[in-house]
């Protein structure tokens, strides 16, 4: 049996006024129209923090300052494992332009339950809500 590859992914936990930034995946994407924390794959030779800066710039023209890693989860999917590291981030330039995301929202802790997330992101939501 062939081992499933591990895909390193990073996510930004951006909080403003007790609301968190989430993005909606495009209809043609894997796991279409689910919600997630903004971010993406770490490319070979790239650091987590560099990947976050690049991904948010590409996806939404957001300029961020990356802080500390606060959560890391691993989740098995059909063809691979996702290793998701979530970092606190601060918007340097607050203008958001959804280029490579379908939509975005600012949600409170109480509103997370209204959105459907992929497994790894849901694990992160659960940790966030438990304060861990």
Walk through the language-model features, giving the residues of each:
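Hydrophobic packing within well-folded, soluble alpha/beta domains
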Residues: 48, 52-56, 69, 87, ...
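Nudix hydrolase/Nudix homology domain
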Residues: 32, 80, 97-132
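Conserved N-terminal beta-strand and adjoining loop/helix that marks the start
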Residues: 1-20, 41
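Active-site-adjacent beta-strand/loop module that shapes the phosphate/pyrophosphate-binding cleft
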Residues: 63, 72-96, 103-105
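Conserved Nudix-box catalytic region and its N-terminal flanking loop in Nudix hydrolases
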Residues: 19-58
């Amino acid at each position: 049996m062939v081992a499933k590859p591990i895909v390193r992914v990073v996510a930004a936990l951006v909080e403003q006024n007790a609301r968190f930034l989430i993005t909606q995946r495009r209809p043609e994407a894997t796991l279409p129209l689910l919600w997630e924390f903004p971010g993406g794959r770490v490319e070979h030779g790239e650091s987590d923090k560099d990947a976050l800066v690049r991904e948010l710039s590409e996806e939404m023209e957001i300029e961020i300052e990356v802080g500390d890693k606060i959560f890391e989860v691993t989740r098995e999917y059909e063809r691979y494992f996702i290793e998701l590291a979530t970092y606190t981030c601060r918007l340097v330039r607050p203008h958001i332009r959804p280029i490579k995301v379908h939509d975005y929202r600012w949600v409170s802790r109480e509103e997370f339950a209204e959105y459907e997330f992929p497994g790894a992101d849901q694990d992160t939501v659960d940790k966030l809500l438990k304060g861990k």
